[in-house]
Swiss-Prot record:
The keyword Amino-acid biosynthesis belongs to this UniProt entry's keyword annotation: yes
One Gene Ontology cellular component annotation held by this UniProt entry: cytoplasm
Functional pathway: Amino-acid biosynthesis; L-histidine biosynthesis; L-histidine from 5-phospho-alpha-D-ribose 1-diphosphate: step 4/9
Protein name as it appears in the record: 1-(5-phosphoribosyl)-5-[(5-phosphoribosylamino)methylideneamino] imidazole-4-carboxamide isomerase
Residue numbers annotated as active site: D8 (proton acceptor), D129 (proton donor)
CDD domains reported for this sequence: HisA (cd04732)
Gene: hisA
Naturally occurring in which organism (per UniProt): Clostridium botulinum (strain Kyoto / Type A2)
Cellular localization per UniProt: Cytoplasm
Chief location category: cytoplasm
Amino acid sequence: MIILPAIDLKEGKCIRLYQGDFKASKVVAEDPIEVALKFKENGAEYIHIVDLDGALTGEIKNLSIISSIIKTINIPVELGGGIRNLNTIDMLIGAGIERIILGTAALNNRGLVEEAVKKYDEKIAIGIDAKNEKVAINGWLNVSSINYIDFAKEMEKIGVRNIIFTDISKDGTLKGPNLKQLEKLNESISCNVIASGGIKDIEDLKVIKEMDVYGAIVGKAIYSGNINLNEAIKIINKGSSK
């Protein structure tokens, strides 16, 4: 199982949200490039970045910092937040982003997902952010009537290979992930599932690994010191190729 440390960008700084609430944001680092380098030094093989300004506005806002991170760390980066059209996807892949996460755009524009997957295959991931099992969009400000499993199955039919699942009520809380929903999703589709939201310690990571989930995104638990990234990667990778 792969562990992806998370960087959430707002106005050029590293921040953490609580349950997706932009009013409950806290700056955890002034220099995201330094944070990314530290993640790499601690053994990260992949970094998860969200442009929170982009998620709200529908346009990538932190591109210069994201580009600097890619050039500096030289390990794969996946990016989500505000990616709403194929031109933006082309530009970001051209800038060196390894995997693009579509969230709101995937729900509002199935045609975009089809085009993007046809062109970039596994470089396209779908971010499914759920609240009470319903898919949320627009920086988590609006909740749709669509069930998260139904949506995941629809994306799989299109050809999507990677799904990032977040239970919003758990995100940034350090109260543990929604294991029940995660397991249900992982059993319902054959895509790679990446767990996100609420992971608080190494025990959570062990449980997620036992479910045969492809990856786990860890944010607040690293910044708060609950998880030592280097140790976690060693423990989770011990005796395992997945």
